[in-house]
C-alpha cells in the first residue's frame, strides 16, 4: 500500500510536465514574426499635380485591369485500361495416354424363332377295290326247303349247323349251331374249335343296312366284308372289317348293321359276312 501511495504523485507530476512541454512547443510554432524598425519609405500621390502627358490634372492613371482567373488546365484523360484475357495454358500431352473405354453396346435379345408348321400330309385318294364276284354255294338237296343240316358223332366233336336266307346251305363241324337271316346272301362254312380264341368259322348274313345319304349323293359304291365274332347264345362280341369298300361311310354303315344283327350259336363262332352297296 505504501508503494502505491508513493507512485501515484510521481505519475501525476510526470504527466503534468509532459503537458507543459507540448504547450511550449505549440506556442513556439504559432508565434508571430516581429517587424524590425528601420527606414520608412513614404509614397507620394503625384496625380494632384497634373500629368506630364497633357492630361488634365486630377486625372489619375488608368486603373489596372482586374486579373482574370487562370483557367485550370484540363485533366488528362486516362486511356481505358485494356482488359486482360485469361491465358489458357495447355499442358503437353503425356507420353503415355490411356485410351478411353468405349461403352459396350447393349446386346439386344434375339427374337425367338417360331417353329415352322409341319406340312400336312396330302390325303391320297383311296383306290376303289375291284369287285369280286360272289361265289354261289353249290346247291345240295336238303331234307326241308331253305334249311341245311349236318350230323356227326358228338364224341368226335361234331355238331349241327343250320342257316336260312335267300340262298345258302352248307355244313359245319363243331359243337352248337348257328343261324343267319336277312336280305343279303349268306354263306355257311366249316370251322374247328369251341373257344373265344379259336372260334368256329361260318358264313352268315345280316339285314341290308340303310344306304348313307351322302354316299348316294357322291355315287359311292362297293362291297364290305365283315368278320363278326358271336358268343354262345348269339351275342355279337366284336365286328372287324376284313375288306373295305373304299369309303368310310359305307364301312361304318355295314359295321353298325352287323352289331345290331342277330345270330344263333351254341359256341363261339366267327361269321364272315359280305355286304354289298350298289346304286341302281
UniProtKB/Swiss-Prot annotation:
Disulfide bridge map: none
Pfam families in the cross-refs: TonB_C (PF03544)
Membrane topology (Cytoplasmic): 1-5
Single Gene Ontology BP annotation: siderophore transport
Compartment(s): Cell inner membrane
Compositional bias ranges of the Gly residues kind: 165-184
Periplasmic topology ranges: 28-280
Biased composition (Basic and acidic residues): 90-143
Renumbered residue ranges of the record's region Disordered: 51-217
Domain of life: Bacteria
Gene Ontology terms: cellular component: outer membrane-bounded periplasmic space; plasma membrane protein complex
UniProt cross-references to Gene3D superfamilies, sorted A to Z: 3.30.1150.10
Transmembrane segments: 6-27
SUPFAM superfamilies named in the record: TolA/TonB C-terminal domain (SSF74653)
Domain TonB C-terminal: 196-280
Claim: Membrane is one of the keywords in the record: yes
One Gene Ontology term of the molecular function aspect: energy transducer activity
Composition skew (Pro residues), residue ranges: 64-83
NCBIfam families per the UniProt record, alphabetical: tonB_Cterm (TIGR01352)
Family label: Belongs to the TonB family.
Function: Interacts with outer membrane receptor proteins that carry out high-affinity binding and energy dependent uptake into the periplasmic space of specific substrates. It could act to transduce energy from the cytoplasmic membrane to specific energy-requiring processes in the outer membrane, resulting in the release into the periplasm of ligands bound by these outer membrane proteins. Required for heme utilization and virulence.
Identification of the protein by name: Protein TonB
Gene label: tonB
